[in-house]
Amino acid sequence: MDSNWINCPSVFSSSSSSSRRCQSRSDLYLGGGYEDLEGEDDLKAEFICPFCAEDFDIVGLCCHIDEEHPVEAKNGVCPVCTKRVGLDIVGHITTQHANFFKVQRRRRLRRGGYSSTYLALKKELREANLQSLLGGSSSFTSSTNIDSDPLLSSFMFNSPSVNQSANKSATPVTVGNAATKVSIKESLKRDIQEAPLSGEDQEKAKKSEFVRGLLLSTMLEDDF
């Protein structure tokens, strides 16, 4: 029990030192600081771990060896130059093959630069298309935008005339409808007047004419 507790600090210290080494590899990879070498683009991008035969890039390989094979790394074959290293494989790679870190960093920056440039161009193209659809700016109804867009200007200036012509065409229709209604009413009255009357209706008509005649004669006598 005591021996386990005694060995625990060494385990923690080895784990923390491994993390620090991995962080230093990442800092080395991100920071660069190496001179450009001729033919560096032709160098391999991935390497095989000499202990588990997995593929990694140069930084991933160093971190993998630090974390997964800290004991075996003290004596093994360098995956870059295939030479046997008796002390520290990761230290050998970072010192003797530092140009691979520079190549890896440059490739990463190239990929990031391409993607950022592509996104910027795509954004500009989208904004240009949107601007052309809206007439060039948010205040697309201004005189400048109307003059620059003949289709929009024709629509803006011709719309009142279209409305006026529509109103003019609607007015005769209304007058014609009223005249048609008047003619229909007159024809109905004419039909009623010309229709044959029954006996009772004829008697009523005679009585009404007699009463009307009396009233007219009375009014004429009063005037004289």
Curated annotation (Swiss-Prot):
Mod. after translation: Phosphorylated in vitro by CPK3 or CPK11.
InterPro entries referenced in this protein's UniProt entry, alphabetically: DI19, Di19_C, Di19_Zn-bd
Pfam family of the protein (one): Di19_C
Gene it is expressed from: DI19-4
Record's GO cellular component terms: perinuclear region of cytoplasm
Keyword Cytoplasm on entry: yes
Span list, region Disordered: 1-23
Localization per record: Cytoplasm, Perinuclear region
Name of the protein: Protein DEHYDRATION-INDUCED 19 homolog 4
Compositionally biased spans, kind Low complexity: 13-23
Induction of synthesis: By salt stress, but not by abscisic acid.
Domain of life where this protein originates: Eukaryota
Keywords associated with the record: Cytoplasm, Phosphoprotein
